[in-house]
Amino acid sequence: MLPLNSVRTHAGRLVPVMLAALFLAGCPSQAPQSPAMQQRVEGKAGASSDYYLQQMQQSSDDSKADWQLLAIHALIQEGKLPQAGNQLGTLPSQLGDKQRQEQRLLTAELAVAQNDMNAANTMLAQLDVKSLSPQQQERYYQAQIKAAQDRTSLTLIRAYIGLEPLLQGDAHQRNIDQTWTALTRLNQQDLSSMVINVDENTLQGWLDLLNLWQTKAQVPSDLQAAIEDWKKRYPRHPAAKQLPSQLGGTPPAAAAPTTGETAPTGGNAIALLLPLNGQAQAFANAIQQGFSAARSGQASLAMPAQPAQLAQAANNAAAATPGAPAVPSPASSTPSAVSPTPAAATTVMPALTAATAGTIPVKVYDTSNQALANVIAQAQKDGATTIVGPLLKNEVEQLPGLNPSLNVLALNQPEHIQPNPNICYFALSPEDEAADAAQFIHKQGKQHPLILAPRGNLGDRVVAAFAKSWQQQSGGVVLQQRTGSMYDLKQAINSGAGIPLNGQPVITAASAPQPSTTVGGLTIPNQAPPIAAVTSDGNVDAIYIIATPDELALLKPMIDMRNKGASRPALYASSRSYQAGLGPDFRFEMEGLQFSDIPLLTGASPALMQQVSTQFRNDYSLVRLFAMGMDAWKLASDFSQLHQPGSSLSGATGILSASSDCVVNRKLTWLQFRQGQLVPAS
């Protein structure tokens, strides 16, 4: 079967070319090289190396070198580097001009595959790019880009610019994004020392666009107007037709490797499995955009930031986005159970270098219209070594039964974890936040917490996760109390009586009695111990509230109304209560309340937060999923770190660490409302 990568440029002429090649093999030794054979030599090897080597053995002297060059190309693509080197060494000394060009290009590509970048650059310098065919030019620029090892330089940027007109579709948009990423990494010294030729209008346009972005990025409306003016000055510039994704362009639909990019032997290749159609499409798109932005280097956090800096940035963000719609946390839309096992984070995972990121190919697969088993099989057939996804919980629950041989970073969690050395689970869930809240509240010295949660499945899950984590901290009893609808809350606040805190103990698996006892073959049900009601007149000293901002605006005053004085319990909330554009009245009303959220939304990178929030129209649920995509890239690109005890990673969704079952836990950022401002929680 022919490799898939032959389809892109040669599908239309593959059969006639094969017939022409077979015809040549039977021609007399004096037959001239056909144009079709030249195209095959200059293009991408479409068959296996074994086939080409067999044709080489059966061919006359005139066409033998052509088949040998094709065999060398195929050997490099297949990762058979020693054999490719041996064949290069046995090429005849007398080659035609076009054959000599192909030999030099193959030598450079082999050097890149062997990580001998000095040799690759030396050989590339001997090639006249203008004399190469379009297919060879594409390979030439790809080799230049790889030889640069993602070290930003004028040579690298010129290679991206040279490659651009040879690409189409998603590959073209990725080229635009990669060019922009390389430009944004230039420092002021690089820019001031750059010498531009008079005919490099495209490069000059890129530099002018970069200058606009650097000077006007703080005011999005000014930047947008400047970009429109720039488009008028450079109407034929590639970025005028397709802006970089960071500046508002459409991200590639599938982050597949660019043409000619192949995973090195034994290297990493990632398959991203997402539902690109249907009800979860918006969630999947946000994750994919975050994943792609992190991979290309366009989105990263300046971690670690100081708590005061985070609080100030969050204040600025809240003031800058008034009137945003209330949006719940995405946790409720992607339910998953957490089995938190706190890890002592003593080792920080090393940051992935840009050079490493650039060498990891990624391809996106749509899980919305085919069985998960088929998608995984196709990804494995395409050469993937790591799978990120699936996202939907029902598909995640299928993974243990499929027993995949690839590494899998699932983007959700099943109700019950079945340990598997190849599967890790990374989810944004209310249970995850509740477990982190239990640890945070316990560290503040609280002894008797109460959870105020809504009736229904969401409340059940949060209560169970909080209680389980709390018992792992201290073994104490957790109380729970359920809240009603907005109508019920409004009726209660109109009564003026406040909320009586009549909590009931949470029965967890650890504290639940055995259901029965067997004596002499007779089963006797155990009697459950009586559960006494506990009120705030007792010893409740902390209340963890699960509520939307509108619900919280009713709940907190009623709690304060009923519990006055110095002994009132401390109040805590989840990210469900935090949204864009919280006005000053709300912030003053929330005095003293502490809440948690992901670093991206609490000010770890104000510029990125503003950009992504604007992109998603202040829908914080999608911003959180964008951050999840960023962290999924970090985790998947160095999957082995997840299995190292004690390791942690500073991510956009929190400080990440993995349990013994490879469940990724998140330590969130905590802030507090104080005098109308957000300050670090003490």
From Swiss-Prot:
Belongs to the LpoA family. A lipid is attached at residue 27 (S-diacylglycerol cysteine). Residues 1-26 form the signal peptide. SUPFAM superfamilies: Periplasmic binding protein-like I (SSF53822). A lipid is attached at residue 27 (N-palmitoyl cysteine). GO terms for molecular function: enzyme regulator activity. It is a lipid-anchor. InterPro entries: LpoA (IPR007443), Peripla_BP_I (IPR028082), TPR-like_helical_dom_sf (IPR011990). Disulfide bonds: none annotated. GO terms for biological process: peptidoglycan biosynthetic process; regulation of cell shape. Residues 248-262 have a biased composition (Low complexity). Regulator of peptidoglycan synthesis that is essential for the function of penicillin-binding protein 1A (PBP1a). Pfam families: LppC. It is found in: Cell outer membrane. Its main location: membrane. The keyword Lipoprotein applies. Residues 240-262, 314-341 are annotated as: Disordered. This is Penicillin-binding protein activator LpoA. The keyword Secreted does not apply. Keywords: Cell outer membrane, Cell shape, Lipoprotein, Membrane, Palmitate, Peptidoglycan synthesis, Signal. Gene3D superfamilies: 1.25.40.650, 3.40.50.2300, Tetratricopeptide repeat domain.
